[in-house]
């Protein structure tokens, strides 16, 4: 479902993600998603969820969570297990079907909405936590979405993002080049090698196509990453205290432990609270 008020870029991104996250992609999602694939990143996420939930629970007996871009439920489940009430939103029917199965034990505290993110913000609704896990990099204008999310938070509400690529031109050189090398080492074995190479060379010239699904699904991954500093600046100006957690993640199993040991940082999480 695509909002009539979207720009061409936003329409392209929503349509690309809706088409990409089909049943086939859902079945292999864990194999290509580092935050789901690796126990170390699942543990990191679990620790952050514990922190976010503990703060929310101080101010609400049953904290309410709006999970934007909820996907197949890996990020949703820990909040339900902690005792929160969750509204899970996504554009992919296949992903939400998997979420429904994964989180079925908590149906009494789970509401699922098959809408795009813009349709998730309903008049009169407020939440103790807005969660966006592996989501911001899919959205062309993620700053506006976060601004809208901040407006529906309760007085002691929190914004919590996880698993988005650090803006590439803010990375130190060793991290930047290590990140590029390990990505292309993994990508070379994923099929359509020459098509991928052609798209990479085109993007290096600053050329992106509105009708190319590969340019729009992982929107900011194939551009310059997500600007973590701009997000913190915007939220701080609205009275939030922000904590940024930087860490390493990659699809390639051989490189994940190496990057972590070397202290490479290419991915971030933000917890912002009033």
Regions found by a protein language model. Give the residues of each.
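Short alpha-helix
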Residues: 222-239, 245
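A conserved beta-strand element that flanks and buttresses the S-adenosyl-L-methionine
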Residues: 131
